[in-house]
Design a protein with these regions (language model features):
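Short Pro-Gly-centered flexible turn/kink motifs
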Residues: 606-622
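Extracellular polysaccharide-recognition and catalytic grooves
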Residues: 152-392
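Extended polysaccharide-engagement surfaces of secreted carbohydrate-active enzymes
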Residues: 272, 291-593, 623
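Gram-negative bacterial Sec-dependent N-terminal signal peptides
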Residues: 1-22
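Low-complexity, Ser/Thr/Pro/Gly-enriched N-terminal "stalk/linker" regions
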Residues: 24-104
Length: 623
């Protein structure tokens, strides 16, 4: 019987179309199994189970806890005590008052609070901790959850003054930490630990900072004017509105207007897979929960229309569903941002495994609460999300971040299930040479950057090695962004009068070669054309262009590579002498936040004397 079935199956497979046999799951066609399950059910049935596991593990193993071979309390995670307090606090707050297990949970929580009170806990950790204490107080659980001696220590420790001077200056921190300080001051007031005077000053500081660094377009520069705009720049206004709400204040109409701009971007990058931002740092699950934060607070504040709320909620449910299926690994009892060919930012390394679990679950729980309060508790998500996005989101949109000496903007191109994000900014100090900050058409499964990888393999940017050994890429000094439409083809062009000289922590202008770049985006195809014009005669040692692709089974003919598997079907280059392709074989240099690239295509030209403009073009065709 078995052999008959096997033979029958073999015959069926032999005559089946290839697509039926090998129905590839790529990032663009991935759909989470719980895609149409209400967000509240996903959270209740999964997130709390994960928190219960961590609670029991902490009670048993205490500060000696081991997670997938790492020791979280020996990792130097400066936020961990606050994240532990918040994560386990969710369990207490979700346990009914008449539940017989509540008393033991409160006792265990008290012991863990006693254990962590002597540990380092900074800024965000303070914010997480005091926010939980306020909720426990409001629920009437505080006295049973935290001992008087520990609460007195926390009253002294959980203080914005630990990172703000008496002159109201931040102590060696980016200016967006004024928002953290403001929240802590307001939460201390709600605890009865201080009056509202400091909160008022810090609120003014926070809003002044936001206005200074967001200019007239409303998105916050992550640097002191260098022009780094990324997921944080878009998320920050939502965080500010959340801080108002959690401390009993109503956001102003001006803040709601800025939030609407962020919501527009969030809707424009929404998709059926629950995938998040594709550019900048701190992606993976954080790129996804960021969108849910923006959309949930926008829904709660009625910044979205009733119809937009329905589909923003449908997308948010898919993000939660994706977290449980894609990011969470039941065998590890943890999310996994570090295995399976995935690579994340150094500061989110595996040593922070426990804190990362707690902070992401906290974000899912908090945004779920916001959706519940907005009227969506246990609501069945709309199933026709793709059709709605196709109909209501512009196929092409441009959001300006800054204008002046340099232009900074985000172009979004929607092509069916693919969402292409071309972020034209300057990564600035510490990020300018990292590919997630390059002006590339990022799209999951098609083009991705590699976190903290530097420019050793400058993804899809021609790299000039000059005769003096210096290396240049066109990454930072973008001017004169222009867009045009020709039928269903969209064109974006810009110029750079200086290239980015590599090797320093900050970008350095190098005026030996000028660059004019044109992108053409159309259905199934993206083309970049670069015209490099030397200032005088320039001696070049080598030009190289690398593309790390998620597609594999590559065949190369001349300077065209075709792929048998993956979303990218063809990659072709002109203007360089030769190309070669090779499998990446799991090399860490070629890993995106959500998985490994499979093939590296390298094109290059040897020594040349550059007197005339040189055109280099690449085209990616995808399905």
């Amino acid at each position: 019987m078995t052999s008959l079935n096997s033979t029958a199956l073999a015959v069926l497979l032999a005559f089946a179309p290839a697509s039926a046999v090998l129905a590839e799951t790529t990032p663009a066609n991935y759909v989470p199994p719980l895609a149409t399950t209400p967000m509240n059910r996903i959270v209740q049935d999964n997130a709390y189970q994960q928190l219960d596991f961590f609670f029991k593990k902490l009670v048993t193993e205490k500060e000696g806890i081991i997670m997938d071979g790492t020791s979280p309390f020996k990792s130097g995670d400066k936020f961990l005590p606050g994240k532990v307090a918040a994560g386990l606090g969710h369990v207490l707050l979700n346990t009914p008052k008449d539940d017989p297990t509540l008393e033991q949970k409160l006792k265990d929580y008290r012991e863990i609070a006693d254990m962590t009170v002597g540990m380092d806990n900074h800024t965000w950790g303070i914010y997480y901790y005091i926010g939980t204490l306020v909720k426990l107080k409001q629920a009437g659980l505080l006295e049973r959850a935290v001992s008087p001696a520990t609460l007195e220590k926390l009253r002294k420790q959980l203080d914005w003054r630990t990172f703000v001077t008496p002159q109201w200056d931040l102590i060696s921190l980016p200016t967006n930490y004024y928002g953290v300080a403001f929240s802590i001051a307001r939460l201390r007031m709600l605890m009865g630990w201080e009056d509202d005077s400091a909160g008022k000053v810090l609120l003014e500081k926070m809003l002044t900072h936001y206005k200074k660094y967001s200019g007239k377009f409303g998105f916050s520069d992550e640097t002191d004017g260098e022009g780094r705009f990324d997921r944080y720049s878009i998320l920050l206004i939502a965080e500010i509105c959340e801080r108002f709400l959690e401390t009993g204040l109503q956001p102003t109409d001006e803040l709601k207007g800025l939030l609407r701009k962020a919501a527009d971007i969030a809707l424009n990058v929404a998709n059926t897979g629950g995938v998040g931002f594709s550019f900048g740092r701190s992606l993976g699950p954080y790129g996804e929960t960021a969108l849910v934060e923006i959309l949930s607070v926008s829904a709660y504040l009625n910044v979205l229309t009733p119809e937009e709320k329905q589909y923003a909620y449908a997308f948010s449910s898919r993000v939660a569903a994706r977290y449980m299926d894609f990011w969470y690994d039941p065998a590890m009892h943890s999310l996994d941002m570090w295995g399976k060919g995935r690579r994340t930012d150094t500061y989110r390394g595996k040593h922070r495994i426990l804190g990362e679990n707690f902070s992401l679950l906290h974000q899912l729980l908090s945004t779920n609460d916001m959706w519940n309060d907005a009227g969506f508790k246990d609501v069945q998500p709309k199933a026709d999300l793709q059709a709605w996005l196709d109909k209501n989101c512009p196929q092409f949109s441009v959001t300006t971040f800054a204008q002046g000496d340099y232009d900074r903007a985000l172009a979004i191109f929607r092509d069916g299930k693919h969402v292409v994000s071309l972020n034209m900014i300057n990564g600035g100090i510490s990020q300018h040479d990292n590919s997630p900050y390059y002006p590339l058409p990022f799209a999951p499964g098609i083009v991705s950057g590699v976190a903290d990888a530097g420019a050793a393999h400058a993804q899809l940017l021609p790299k000039f090695t000059m005769a003096d050994g210096t290396q240049l890429i066109g990454a930072a000094w973008i001017k004169d962004i222009k867009t045009a439409k020709d039928g269903q083809r969209y064109t974006i062009s810009y110029r750079q009068d200086e290239l980015d000289l590599l090797g320093k922590r900050s970008p350095v202008k190098d005026a030996r070669i000028k660059l004019h770049t044109t992108y053409k985006l159309e259905h199934g195809r993206m083309t970049r054309t670069d015209v490099y014009t030397p200032v005088g005669t320039q001696e070049v040692q080598k030009i190289s262009l690398e593309f790390a692709s998620f597609s594999d089974q590559a065949t190369i003919q001349g300077n065209t590579v075709t792929f048998a598997q993956g979303d990218v079907k063809e990659y072709s280059v002109s203007g360089l002498q030769q190309c070669q392709s090779a499998p990446t074989n799991g090399n860490q240099d070629f890993m995106a936040p959500y998985g490994a690239m499979k093939t590296l295509v390298t094109c290059s030209t040897g020594k040349l004397t550059l007197k005339e403009p040189l055109t280099i073009q690449w085209t990616v065709k995808y399905q």
